[in-house]
Every structure is written in C-alpha cells, then in structure tokens.
C-alpha cells in the first residue's frame, strides 16, 4: 500500500502515472495560506462550481495575511475552519483513488502526508421516476435510480428509525463497485446478517453490474428452478421487506434491489393488495395462482389429453382438434413446442430491439403466427390458442417468468413423450423443486409450512389489514416458532 508523501511533487507524479493520460483527470495547483497545494478531481464527477464556491473563495479571503506550513494548514482546514471537509482524511494512494472515483475532490498540501477530502459530487444520474416493470394503481410512484447514495436516501426517508442499518462497502471486482447491505437491527436475525455480510465480503465476482451478481455466492449449490430471492425497483416494497426482518442489497449503478430470503407466496403479492379490500385482494391472489399453474401445465395437459386420452374431450371439441391436426405436418407436441419457442423469440426480440421498432415486431409476429402459419398449414388454431393463453398468463406473475417458461417446455416434452406418466412426473418434479428450495434456512414455501393458518391470514387469501397489523410478521420469528412446534 503506497503511502502519501510529504512532497507535493511526488504525490502529483504518482497520480500522473495513474491518470495522466485520462481526459477527465483534473489537477489545479493553488496557494493556500501561503502553502503550495493542489486540488485533484475527475471532471464530470465532482462539481467545479461547488468547489470554487465552498473552498477557493473562502480561502482567498483568509489567506492574504496568514502564512502556514503544510501541516498547520492541514490542521486548520480540518479542525479550525468552516471549510466543508470530510472528517476522515486520506493517507494512502488507494484511499485517494477511491475518493476520486467516488466523485470527491481532494486537496494535497506541500509538507503534509494526508489529503483533505471535499464532498462536491456532481454526478449525473437518472431522475427518480416510476419503475416500468412494477405497475400499481395506488401507493408510491417512486422508483430506485442508478446511484447508490440516492437509493439509500430513498430508503432512509421511508424507514425513519434508528434501527435501519445501511452498510456500504466496495466489492472485490475490477471496477471496485460499491454496494450496500440494508437491514433493521431490531427485526433481522443478527446471525443471518453476519452470515450475509461475510458472504458479500468474500465474494469475488469479475464484474458487479447488478445485485443479482451476488446470488451464486448467497445461494451456492446445484442448479435450481426457483431462486429464493426477490427483486424490486420500488423503495416502498424494499421498506416493507425490511420491516419483515429481511435483508436488502443495493449495488451502485443498478436500480434493482435484491431482497432475501424471498418466499414463493410473495411472487403473487403487490402493493395494491393492501390498498384494496381483503375480499378483492384475495380474489386477485387466487387469480394469480390460477394463472401461474395455467401457464405451466395447460400446454402439457392439452397435449396429453389430445394425444393419449382423447375420450376425455367433448366430441365436438375432439372433432375440431382432429380436423385441425390432420392439416399440419408435425405431431401435436412438436407443434406446441414450436409455437412456444416462436413466442419466446418474439418476446426476446421485442425486449432487446429499439422501442421505435416495437410496433413492427408486433405486426410481423401477428401476421406470421396468427395468419400465415395457419394458412400454410404449419400450425393449427387450437395449438396457437392454447399457447397464446399461456403466454399472456405468465405476465400475471412476472417474478416467476423464468421457472414458468422452463417448466412449461419440460411439461410439454414429458407429456408428449410419456403421456399421463410424463405429466405426473412433471408435476411431482415441480413440487420437489419447490419443497427443496430454501434461502438462509428459510423454506421457499414459507410461511405455509409454519403453523399459522396461511389461508386465513396473508397467504393465498388475505385477512383485513387491521387484523394483520395486530399480529405483525417477522420471517425469523415465524421460523423459530415453526422449529419449536415441529
């Protein structure tokens, strides 16, 4: 670790060796209290206007009749003046680089081996606006932005207690990306907080561009269909999860907050659930559960029944399916797989392409799948109808899009190759994957395994919010209660 020298020229030479060829590196030599010095910063990250206003103008008024050495000027600025300097100076080159790349300005003085830091960040970032991926009718419209400090302030404004802890650190990556671990110390399990803190400190991702990059370290082990973490771009949702004792991880440069541990039932909840009546919220949750199982199993059930158990279908429906399939060259399950894959290709194209071309994709996909495929006899109308229903139903629970898509394809394959046996195998594999998933010792199906009557409280159905508020919910207390009774 290279310590700062008392020689200003040596310190500037070391900085020039690191950043001398960078276009945004800025170094301005000044004389402060009769002592030579230099202000170093990165243009565009630190605000020059704020720097001149807060530091140089005040120094110019005072330094005309004062002559100090470097050490004396350092002590006076840090402890005996009104200059807005940080309380912690920098004493080595790594600390200096970290402050500069965070958008701060550093004052180096001749004869002083420490630098004075000024918080004059002028970073440009996306404004706080409503996230497009999480819509709601009522409640807060704020969303996380890309700057970590702004996101932490949004959380602090909602959770206005002295129990909210926000621990910031730098990840061991090539970019030294900053992240923050947030929790409420009176609600979170201290052992789990220490465990997650140690995991984050020991993680070695090559890059850290989003909070999801930490998941392989937080949840090591074999591949799994369901990932027991939750992502949100809404500070209100993150604040609610903190009050439940959960942990929130934020990464600089990403508006997505990682919440863990996450529960399967939370994928069917939203902010509007608690702003509506209990009856209507329960109806919507039942509808979401139905939509999820519909998008996973409907194509497989359709293939299984139409190919292996046609006697279960009404005669008129069976005749129409049979007539449509005779006009197509592919087996029914291969046709269903082809339609599902085409829909996924269209979705991916619409997601990645420029927004100005989105209408063109919709028009072309409607002509190809909706009209041309049927007219040429490559696909049948019943198959397209079933695949379209499942494609729409999956967006009711966007947090389960990835496992639902993989399960749908696997169910169609097993149902087409093995019939009812394959369909049953797919269903039991789905249940086994759910039951075997956990995070930080909390089962993914919690709180349903816990003895707390989930159907009548805040599970598939929801009780009145006034009644829920009397009991409260803390995920670690529920876990311990379940262990004691089991």
Predicted regions and their residues:
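Membrane-embedded alpha-helical signal segments
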Residues: 1-297, 311, 315, 435-486
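C-terminal TM-helix exit segments that contain a strictly Trp-centered aromatic cap at the helix terminus
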Residues: 215, 301-306
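Generic detector of multi-pass transmembrane helix bundles and their immediately adjacent loops
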Residues: 301, 314-486
């Amino acid at each position: 670790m290279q310590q700062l020298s008392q020689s200003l020229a040596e310190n500037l030479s070391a900085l020039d060796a690191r950043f001398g060829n960078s276009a945004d590196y800025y170094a301005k030599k000044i004389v402060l209290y009769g002592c030579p010095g230099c202000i170093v910063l990165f243009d565009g990250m630190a605000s020059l206007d704020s720097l001149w206003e807060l530091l140089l103008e005040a120094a110019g008024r005072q330094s005309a009749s004062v002559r100090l050495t470097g050490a004396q000027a350092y002590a006076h600025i840090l402890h005996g003046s009104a200059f807005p300097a940080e309380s912690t100076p920098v004493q080595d080159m790594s600390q200096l680089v970290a402050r500069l790349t965070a958008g701060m300005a550093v004052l180096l003085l001749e004869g002083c081996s420490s630098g004075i830091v000024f918080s004059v960040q002028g970073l440009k970032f996306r404004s706080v606006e409503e996230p497009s991926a999480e819509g709601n009718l009522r409640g807060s419209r704020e969303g996380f932005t890309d700057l970590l400090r702004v996101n932490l302030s949004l959380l602090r404004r909602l959770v206005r207690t002295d129990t909210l802890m926000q621990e910031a650190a730098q990840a061991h990556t090539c970019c030294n990306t900053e992240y923050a671990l947030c929790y409420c110390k009176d609600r979170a399990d201290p052992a789990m907080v220490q465990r997650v803190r140690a995991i984050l400190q020991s993680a070695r991702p090559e890059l850290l561009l989003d909070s999801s990059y930490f998941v392989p370290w937080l949840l090591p082990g074999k591949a799994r269909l369901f990932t027991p973490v939750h992502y949100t771009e809404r500070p209100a949702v993150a604040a609610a999860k903190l009050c439940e004792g959960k942990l929130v991880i934020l990464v600089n440069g990403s508006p997505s907050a990682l919440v863990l541990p996450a529960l399967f039932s939370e994928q069917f909840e939203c902010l509007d659930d608690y702003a509506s009546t209990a009856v209507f919220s329960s109806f919507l949750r039942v509808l979401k559960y139905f939509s999820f199982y519909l998008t996973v199993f409907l194509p497989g059930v359709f293939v299984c029944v139409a190919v292996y158990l046609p006697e279960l279908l009404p005669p008129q429906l069976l005749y129409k399916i049979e007539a449509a399939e005779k006009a197509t060259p592919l087996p029914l399950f291969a046709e269903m797989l082809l339609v599902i894959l085409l829909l996924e290709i269209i979705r991916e194209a619409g997601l990645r392409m420029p927004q100005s071309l989105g209408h063109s994709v919709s028009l072309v996909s409607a002509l190809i799948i909706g009209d041309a495929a049927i007219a040429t006899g490559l696909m049948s109308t019943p198959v397209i109808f079933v695949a379209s229903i499942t494609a729409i139903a999956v967006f009711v629970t966007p947090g389960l899009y990835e496992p639902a898509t993989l399960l749908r394809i696997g169910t169609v394959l097993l149902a087409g190759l093995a019939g009812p046996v394959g369909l049953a195998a797919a269903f039991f594999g789905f249940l086994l994957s759910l039951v075997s998933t956990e995070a930080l010792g909390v089962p993914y199906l919690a709180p349903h395994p816990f003895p707390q009557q989930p159907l009548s409280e805040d599970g598939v159905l929801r009780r009145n919010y006034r009644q829920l508020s009397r009991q409260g919910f803390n995920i670690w207390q529920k876990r311990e209660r379940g262990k004691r009774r089991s």
